[in-house]
C-alpha cells in the first residue's frame, strides 16, 4: 500500500534564520520529524544554493522554505528524480500565474535569461537508498531590486509589473 504525505504538516516558521536547509538537516539528524514538515522564514541570513553559492533576498519578499522528505522508494542513483519533480512543480506553479519559465538543470528556474528561483536538495543516504531529502526552494516573489553582483535575477513582481 502506498502512503501519502501532506506537505506543510507541520510547518515551522521563523522571522529570521540562518538557513532553512541547515535547520531541516539538524532536525533530521537529531530527531524524527514528520515527512512533509516545512520550514519557512521571512529572511535567511545565510541562504545558499548549489556548490556553496549564496542565496540573497530582502526580508519578507520571497518564498524561502525547506521541505523534509523521506523518499525511501528511491535508490541513491535516482536522486536526480527529486530535482526533476521539484523543478517541474515550481514551473507548474508559476505557470498558474501566467509566468512562462524554463528550467536550467539541475536546479534553477529562469524567465528568459533571468533567474527567478533556485532549488537546493540535500540528501541523507542510507546504504543504497535515500533516507531523507531536504528540498530547499528560494523563489523571488515581491522583490523589486537586487544587490549586485547577482547574475540576472528577477521576481514575480518584476515580471508581472504589479
Question: For each predicted feature, which ranges?
Answer:
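N-terminal lobe of the biotin/lipoate ligase/transferase fold
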Residues: 1-96
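Long, positively charged amphipathic alpha-helical accessory segments at protein N-termini or as interdomain linkers
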Residues: 6, 72-77, 81-101, 111-162
Amino acid at each position: 500500500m502506498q502512503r501519502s504525505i501532506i506537505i506543510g504538516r507541520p510547518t515551522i516558521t521563523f522571522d529570521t534564520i540562518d538557513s532553512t536547509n541547515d535547520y531541516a538537516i539538524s532536525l533530521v539528524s537529531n530527531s524524527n520529524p514528520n515527512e512533509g514538515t516545512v520550514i519557512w522564514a521571512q529572511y535567511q541570513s545565510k541562504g545558499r544554493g548549489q556548490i556553496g553559492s549564496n542565496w540573497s533576498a530582502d526580508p519578507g519578499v520571497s518564498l524561502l522554505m525547506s521541505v523534509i522528505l523521506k523518499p525511501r522508494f528511491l535508490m541513491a542513483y535516482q536522486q536526480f528524480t527529486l530535482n526533476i519533480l521539484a523543478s517541474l512543480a515550481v514551473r507548474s506553479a508559476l505557470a498558474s500565474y501566467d509566468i512562462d519559465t524554463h528550467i536550467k538543470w539541475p536546479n534553477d528556474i529562469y524567465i528568459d535569461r533571468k533567474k527567478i528561483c533556485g532549488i537546493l536538495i540535500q540528501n541523507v543516504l542510507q546504504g543504497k537508498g535515500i533516507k531523507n531529502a531536504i528540498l530547499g526552494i528560494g523563489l523571488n516573489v515581491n522583490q523589486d531590486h537586487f544587490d549586485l553582483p547577482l547574475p540576472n535575477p528577477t521576481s514575480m513582481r518584476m515580471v508581472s509589473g504589479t
